[in-house]
Structures are given as C-alpha cells and as structure tokens.
C-alpha cells in the first residue's frame, strides 16, 4: 500500500474566482497566483490511480478567513463521501478566529483524521494564543495529528515559504510534548537536529513528511532523515498538485523495501489511526 501523507484539493469555485479569494485571505494570497495549479478531488484520484497510490491525505491551508476554512473543509468532507477508500480527510482552521474551536469539533464529528495543514507566521504570539492552545487541547483529547508547515531558515525563497523555522517548531513541541505533530517539508530541517539526544527525547510524538521534496532537497534526504530521526517517523508526501506524483515517487527508488514500507504504509497507518 502507498499512502500520500499530504495533498491539497480545493473546490472549483475557488479555481474560478482566484482573485476574489486572494483578497479575503492572506495565506491564500501568499500561496496562490494565476500560475498556481489547483485541482479538485476527481483530478487527484485520477493521478493516484495512474501512479499506484492507494490513499491520500487531503488537507487545507492555514486560512486567515473563517468562511474560507469552512468552505474548504466542507469540500474535503464531501470528497471523502465520494471517494471513501481513497481520501483521508483533514480539516484546517483560522487559528485567530473565535469560531475555530466550534468548526474543529464539527469536522471531528464528521470523521476527519487530523488538523492541517496549518501555516504559522506570527511566531512571537502564537505560543500564547488562547485559540491555538485550545485547538491543541482538542487535538490531544481526540488523539488527532496536526500538520504544520515547516520553513527552511536558509535557502531559496518561494511562495508560501513562511517563517515556521525549526527553532519555533521545537519550542512548540517543548510546550506540547503529548500532542502529535507532523512537520511538513521535513520540518524545515528540524529532523536533522534529532541527532541531538535531548531533541530526540522531547520529539517522541513528532513526525516529518516529505512534502515538495524534489523542490527543496536532494533525494538523499530520505535516508538522511531516517538515520537522523527514526524509520518510524518519516512520511512520504507529495504536496500534490504542487509537485507531480510520478516525480515524487521516483525519488524514493533507492530506498530499501523495509524503508519504503515504513514511509509509504506502516507510519501513516499508525499516525492517522487507519
């Protein structure tokens, strides 16, 4: 079995009215322009079948507009009904909206398997953000993983890179060691610091996905991450439609069968409670 641990789908209404949604949501504005590829569930399923992928996590973004968050959550939940065997639904919320806790509980009641993808840029205030901390408490109560975008502190700039640097992500883990976190893009490099015993000890509930790996890192990062952290904590993820599925899968060809079984199957089955 191959599970893609991070993809994105959006309703067609957003594709047709891109500029309208860019005006109302700052994260959407950061990530999307006229050249950004947006797909609906049917296109994702088609590409999954072509590339032998059995299941995919479908996630939102770190919205700053509550109504947009609801729209995308509803679409992901509808897509789950249409493709119950293929879609692993996640929900996302505006971490500054007082209505987000209610929205999260609504999505949990409808069967989401996790929260995310969240994009956190206001690093100075987020650790003391009451709404965000309540979201973490709800996630902990329901044993739900939280996908958070990780940003590399050096390297090339790109749309939506953000400022969720390893130093901040580790502070988040320190304060919330019982929560299950999945840090995208190998946590912006946080995975490498698990070679330090004190970091590894505190990060026992932290996982790392490989979203957009061909855009960010050489393929050797899979083996490097396994050696730095654990074979049990690395998740294959494409970030489709940003990156072609075939290209992402090709990057893993050199891994051993047991390494592939962990990143494709064993690890996501465990963390997503499949």
Locations of the language-model features?
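Catalytic pocket-lining loop regions of alpha/beta-barrel enzymes
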Residues: 113-114, 126-235
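Short, surface-exposed alpha-helical segments at coil->helix boundaries
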Residues: 41, 70-74, 163-166, 193, ...
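Active-site neighborhood of phospho(di)ester-bond hydrolases with catalytic His/Asp-centered motifs
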Residues: 2-5, 58-59, 90-91, 116, ...
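Conserved, mostly hydrophobic/aromatic
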Residues: 6, 48, 76, 107, ...
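Mid-to-C-terminal alpha-helical segments outside catalytic/metal-binding sites
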Residues: 1-8, 12-55, 105, 228-235, ...
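Generic structural signal for well-ordered alpha-helices
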Residues: 41-45, 73-80, 104, 132, ...
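Active-site environment of divalent metal-dependent phosphoester hydrolases
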Residues: 10-13, 63-66, 95-99, 122-123, ...
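Active-site gating/metal-coordination segments in enzymes
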Residues: 54-55, 63-154
């Amino acid at each position: 079995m191959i599970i893609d641990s991070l993809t994105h789908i959006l309703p067609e209404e957003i594709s047709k009215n891109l500029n309208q949604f860019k005006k109302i949501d700052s994260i959407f504005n950061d990530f999307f322009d006229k050249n950004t590829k947006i797909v609906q569930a049917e296109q994702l399923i088609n590409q999954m079948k072509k590339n032998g992928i059995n299941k995919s996590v479908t996630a939102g973004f770190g919205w700053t507009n509550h109504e947009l968050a609801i729209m995308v959550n509803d679409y992901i939940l509808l897509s789950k009904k249409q493709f119950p065997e293929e879609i692993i639904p996640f929900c996302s919320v505006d971490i500054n909206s007082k209505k987000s806790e209610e929205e999260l509980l609504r999505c949990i009641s409808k069967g989401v398997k996790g929260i995310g993808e969240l994009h956190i840029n206001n690093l100075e205030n987020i650790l003391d953000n009451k709404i965000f901390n309540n979201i973490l408490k709800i996630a902990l109560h329901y044993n739900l993983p939280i996908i958070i975008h990780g940003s590399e502190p050096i390297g090339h700039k790109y749309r939506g890179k953000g400022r969720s640097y390893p130093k901040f992500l580790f502070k988040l883990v320190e304060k919330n060691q019982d929560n299950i976190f999945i840090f995208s893009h190998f946590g912006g490099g946080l995975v490498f610091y698990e070679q330090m015993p004190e970091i590894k000890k505190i990060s026992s509930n932290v996982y790392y996905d490989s979203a957009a790996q061909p855009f960010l890192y050489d393929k050797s990062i899979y083996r490097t991450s396994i050696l730095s952290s654990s074979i049990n904590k690395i998740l294959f993820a494409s970030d489709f439609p940003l990156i072609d599925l075939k290209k992402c899968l090709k990057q893993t060809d050199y891994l051993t069968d047991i390494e592939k079984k962990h990143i494709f199957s064993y690890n996501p089955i465990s963390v997503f409670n499949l």
